[in-house]
């Protein structure tokens, strides 16, 4: 405590033992003036500045020099303490950051180990079979498509009585109603249906096979067909011929042709 007071008031320790009676304490006003001067310049005290302060404060130049020397030493010590505190705080901050990084590293390492185990487990498990590919329908050949369309062709009747037949190319060909009727009669009706209500022409005794004539007069009587069968065959041939000639001209009705 006494050393601190001596430093504050500029007491020379070397001369304290030999000249204790000559010790002179600095007043509070002198200490404040020296503090203000030290705050203005913390560098080494120049001789001119030292002489001026000693003359203005009424103390010896040596006492001013000793006070500045002690005050500069305390200031340096305080700066070292402040620097040490700053370094310690920075060190503690770095240690905390290192601990956080170590924790993050450990967490990432555990995640990597877990993911590696999962990948290994998935690699050992059988892989799911791929879904069967959808079978694409193979388009039919042009020839088969045309034949199919020809087989599936149908007749569409319009209001005028004509008929449209679809061909293989998708277009329509108009057909007369008479031709269609004749074709239907030839394909669907039996030959006997043409003569359902007709009467056979009268036959004479000469035409009968059981007449008075001899076998020489009728050489071909054994191969003659009945009259009804002959007429039926002629009617069927006429129906086919009427179907073929329907495009050129409109034929007479099959019944009218037969009776005419």
Curated annotation (Swiss-Prot):
GO terms assigned for molecular function: DNA-binding transcription factor activity, RNA polymerase II-specific; sequence-specific DNA binding
Tissue distribution of the protein: Expressed in roots, leaf sheaths and blades and panicles.
Entry annotated with the keyword Protease: no
Cystine residue pairs: none
Principal subcellular localization: nucleus
A GO biological process held by the record: positive regulation of DNA-templated transcription
DNA-binding annotation, residue ranges on this chain: 19-79
GO cellular component entries: nucleus
Key words of the record: DNA-binding, Homeobox, Nucleus, Transcription, Transcription regulation
Subcellular location: Nucleus
Chain segments carrying region Disordered: 1-24, 121-145, 190-221
SMART domains: HOX (SM00389)
Biased amino acid composition, Acidic residues: 1-10, 205-218
InterPro entries: HD (IPR001356), HDZip_class_I_plant (IPR045224), Homeobox_CS (IPR017970), Homeodomain-like_sf (IPR009057), HTH_motif (IPR000047), Leu_zip_homeo (IPR003106)
Pfam families in the record: HALZ, Homeodomain
Annotated PROSITE patterns: HOMEOBOX_1, HOMEOBOX_2
Region (Leucine-zipper) location: 78-122
UniProt superkingdom: Eukaryota
Function field: Probable transcription factor.
Family indicated by similarity: Belongs to the HD-ZIP homeobox family. Class I subfamily.
Name this polypeptide is given: Homeobox-leucine zipper protein HOX25
Organism: Oryza sativa subsp. indica (Rice)
Gene name of the encoded protein: HOX25
């Amino acid at each position: 405590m006494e050393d601190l007071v001596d430093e504050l008031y500029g007491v020379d320790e070397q001369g304290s033992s030999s000249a204790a009676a000559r010790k002179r304490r600095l007043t509070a006003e002198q200490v404040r003036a020296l503090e203000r001067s030290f705050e203005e310049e913390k560098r080494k005290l120049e001789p001119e500045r030292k002489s001026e302060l000693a003359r203005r404060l009424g103390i010896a130049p040596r006492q001013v020099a000793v006070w500045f020397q002690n005050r500069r030493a305390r200031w340096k010590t305080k700066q070292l303490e402040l620097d040490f505190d700053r370094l310690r705080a920075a060190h503690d901050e770095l240690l905390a950051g290192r601990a956080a990084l170590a924790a993050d590293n450990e967490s990432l390492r555990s995640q990597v180990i877990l993911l590696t185990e999962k990948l290994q487990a998935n690699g050992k498990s059988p892989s799911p079979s791929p879904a069967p590919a959808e079978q694409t329908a193979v388009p039919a050949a042009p020839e088969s498509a045309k034949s199919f369309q020809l087989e599936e062709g149908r007749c569409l009747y319009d209001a005028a009585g004509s008929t449209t037949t679809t061909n293989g190319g998708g277009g329509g060909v108009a057909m007369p109603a008479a031709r269609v009727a004749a074709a239907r009669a030839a394909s669907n009706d039996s030959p006997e249906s043409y003569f359902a209500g007709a009467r056979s022409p009268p036959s004479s005794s000469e035409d009968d096979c059981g007449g008075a004539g001899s076998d020489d007069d009728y050489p071909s009587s054994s191969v003659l067909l009945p009259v009804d069968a002959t007429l039926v065959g002629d009617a069927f041939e006429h129906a086919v011929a009427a179907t073929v000639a329907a495009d050129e001209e409109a034929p007479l009705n099959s019944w009218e042709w037969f009776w005419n």
